[in-house]
């Protein structure tokens, strides 16, 4: 800037030239300058134009004063200049208007002896109008390339390029177009530049304040949108009003956590896995729901620690009925001092466990059935050999020593028998067979199932099958009495199935051992008798 100020005072003069040569020289320079700005239309111009030429005409001839101004070291893209364009536009607009009027009057007065006064004044009027219009556009800060040159330069017009008036960089950083002719001195230019940079700093501060205020407003709006889930919970009312027909859909039984319940319903026995509870009993959640994942992801609710009394009552209720109506669930929750949602979630989890154990038990029973079919194909005692407590009975039947596959299937059958909760009466009471101790006789389902009762019913199932097999082979030895039940007590009475007289007399002769292989159906045990009457009794025994 210091260099440019010092250059302002230097006005090297050129020798007098003829009037046509002067116009030709000016038109050539302006055309080159015009092409330069068209080529670099999207880039901010430098601080000063490479050529500023002002012409002063007199009656004695034409004298040309050309001042060549160098480019100081300055960044092309200065954000302060861009931001301060609108701030400094008002300062220069009035001053440029007076300078343009003064320049217009000087050109009209000095151009009277040049012979081209009408054309010169017309062109000057056009350019002054373009300058005013371009200064208004530049005050707004719009920089389209089409506004740089509203009309082409006439070759006889000697004023400076109008780009210095319409681009904010040219407006603020360049010397004004009439600096040489109208006498804008160094002090005025320095004051203008100082005011320009002060306005740029003020505009930058205002922009930062506006950005901070906008960010604060956006954060407040986001907090206002996300505030209701913080108070009421993300799913505050979901699942609190189940359908009147039942508890919940079977497809959504398993809920490892108390997801569908509001944490405000936790009782005194509730504990939190992530920080305990606050004073009101609500669980303290980790994280904030005002985050981006607050509305999309459910917060983990606290687990309920049930007491022994509550668990025993819930288990007894679950043995009676697997599904609760809304009224029954509310009564049970009131009785146990629990929330309705906690009882519902416990029932969902318990039903899932029940179904899983049922599937495992049925799978093991299917394995045992497949083993029975396998033994039928390749000989041996199919049922007593598979039962782990019938080693002596198998020896009495003349069974071969057990192999590895025998041991595997015996263990599978024992595991199936020891499964505690069977879903319903898988081995229903049969009137012709007296089942062991602790098991009710009759077609109705059992009131409850324990490990011993399940084992007794499974033992009676295999013993009745062995009795049917011995009835099919009258010449074979009779089965041995089974050992006592696991649950303790006397051995069950009447385990051997009586043979009806009419079926024994009317039975056909026994088939040879080469019977066709039965179908390996995992859903039900294979057929064990040729007698149609015994087959119908077996169908009555298994009510799945």
UniProtKB/Swiss-Prot annotation:
Keywords: Developmental protein, DNA-binding, Homeobox, Nucleus, Sensory transduction, Vision. GO terms for cellular component: nucleus. It holds the Pfam family Homeodomain. Residues 247-262 have a biased composition (Acidic residues). Its main location: nucleus. InterPro entries: HD, HD_metazoa, Homeobox_CS, Homeodomain-like_sf, Mediator/Homeobox_domain. It is found in: Nucleus. Residues 266-282 have a biased composition (Basic and acidic residues). SMART domains: HOX. Residues 476-485, 507-516 have a biased composition (Pro residues). Residues 95-105, 156-172 have a biased composition (Basic residues). GO terms for molecular function: DNA-binding transcription factor activity, RNA polymerase II-specific; RNA polymerase II transcription regulatory region sequence-specific DNA binding. B-H1 and B-H2 are abundant in the eye-antenna imaginal disk. Expressed in R1 and R6 cells throughout larval stage until 30 hours after puparium formation, at which time expression is seen in the anterior and posterior primary pigment cells. Coexpressed in embryonic glial cells, neurons of the CNS and PNS, most latitudinal anterior cells of the developing notum and the central circular region of the leg and antennal imaginal disk throughout larval development. One of its GO terms (biological process) is sensory organ boundary specification. PROSITE patterns: HOMEOBOX_1, HOMEOBOX_2. Residues 53-73, 92-179, 236-308, 471-544 are annotated as: Disordered. Residues 283-293 have a biased composition (Polar residues). Residues 299-358 bind DNA. Residues 53-70, 106-131, 492-506 have a biased composition (Low complexity). Belongs to the Antp homeobox family. B-H1 and B-H2 are regulated by members of the wg signaling pathway; wg and dpp. B-H1 and B-H2 are coexpressed and functionally required in R1 and R6 receptor cells and primary pigment cells for normal eye development. Coexpression is also required for the fate determination of external sensory organs, formation of notal microchaetae, formation of presutural macrochaetae, antennal development and for distal leg morphogenesis; segmentation and specification of tarsal segments 3-5. This is Homeobox protein B-H1. It comes from Drosophila melanogaster (Fruit fly). The lineage of its organism: Eukaryota, Metazoa, Ecdysozoa, Arthropoda, Hexapoda.
């Amino acid at each position: 800037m210091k260099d440019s100020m010092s250059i302002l005072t230097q006005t090297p003069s050129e020798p007098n030239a003829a009037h046509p040569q002067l116009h030709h020289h000016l038109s050539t320079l302006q055309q080159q300058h015009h092409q330069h700005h068209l080529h670099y239309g999207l880039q901010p111009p430098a601080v000063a134009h490479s050529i500023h030429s002002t012409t002063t005409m007199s009656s004695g001839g034409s004298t040309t004063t050309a001042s060549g101004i160098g480019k100081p070291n300055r960044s092309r893209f200065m954000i302060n200049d861009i931001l301060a364009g609108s701030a400094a536009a008002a300062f220069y607009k009035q001053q440029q208007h007076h300078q343009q009027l003064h320049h217009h009057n000087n050109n009209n007065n000095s151009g009277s002896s040049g012979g081209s006064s009408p054309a010169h004044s017309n062109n000057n009027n056009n350019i002054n109008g373009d300058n005013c219009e371009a200064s208004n556009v530049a005050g707004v800060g719009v920089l389209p390339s089409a506004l740089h040159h509203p009309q082409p330069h006439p070759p006889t017009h000697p004023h400076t390029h109008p780009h210095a008036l319409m681009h904010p960089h040219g407006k603020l950083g360049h010397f004004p177009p009439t600096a040489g002719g109208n006498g804008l001195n160094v002090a005025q230019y320095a004051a203008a530049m100082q005011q320009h940079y002060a306005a740029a700093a003020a505009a930058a501060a205002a922009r930062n304040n506006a950005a901070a205020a906008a960010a604060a407003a956006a954060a407040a709006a986001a907090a206002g949108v996300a505030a209701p889930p913080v108070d009421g919970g993300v799913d505050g009312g979901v699942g609190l009003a189940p359908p009147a027909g039942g508890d919940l859909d079977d497809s959504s039984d398993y809920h490892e956590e108390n997801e569908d319940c509001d944490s405000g319903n936790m009782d005194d026995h509730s504990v939190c896995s992530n920080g305990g509870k606050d004073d009101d009993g609500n669980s303290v959640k980790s994280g904030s729901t005002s985050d981006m994942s607050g509305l999309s992801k459910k917060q983990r609710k606290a687990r309920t620690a049930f007491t022994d009394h509550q668990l025993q009552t819930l288990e007894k209720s679950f043995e009676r009925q697997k599904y609760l109506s809304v009224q029954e669930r509310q009564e049970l929750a009131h009785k146990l001092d629990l929330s309705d949602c906690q009882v519902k979630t416990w029932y969902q989890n318990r039903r899932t466990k029940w179904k899983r154990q049922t599937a495992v038990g049925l799978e093991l029973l299917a394995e045992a059935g497949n083993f029975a079919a396998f033994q039928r194909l390749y000989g041996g005692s199919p049922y007593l050999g598979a039962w782990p407590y019938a080693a002596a009975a198998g020896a009495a039947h003349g069974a071969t020593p057990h192999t590895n596959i025998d041991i595997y299937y015996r263990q599978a059958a024992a595991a199936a028998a020891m499964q505690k909760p069977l879903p319903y009466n898988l081995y229903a009471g049969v009137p012709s067979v007296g089942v062991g101790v602790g098991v009710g006789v009759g077609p109705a389902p059992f009131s409850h199932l324990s490990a011993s009762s399940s084992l007794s019913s499974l033992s009676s199932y295999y013993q009745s099958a062995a009795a049917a097999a011995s009835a099919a082979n009258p010449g074979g030895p009779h089965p041995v009495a089974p050992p006592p039940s696991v649950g303790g007590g006397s051995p069950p009475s009447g385990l051997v199935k009586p043979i009806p007289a009419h079926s024994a007399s009317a039975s056909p002769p026994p088939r040879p051992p080469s019977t066709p292989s039965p179908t390996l159906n995992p859903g039900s045990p294979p057929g064990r008798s040729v007698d149609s009457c015994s087959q119908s009794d077996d169908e009555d025994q298994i009510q799945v």
